[in-house]
């Protein structure tokens, strides 16, 4: 499973909000930059939406 697929899997398997910190904790071998890139891609594809801002930013699946 690629790093991108692992990040997407964490987001899809999390109920409610997920933060970058949650993803980095579950995938410690993946860089912050990679997580940000995949989250942006998922936002652009309309799979997730951003909630909050700054340090309180979280992401929620669009079901």
Region locations from a protein language model:
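C-terminal regulatory or interaction extensions
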Residues: 1-63
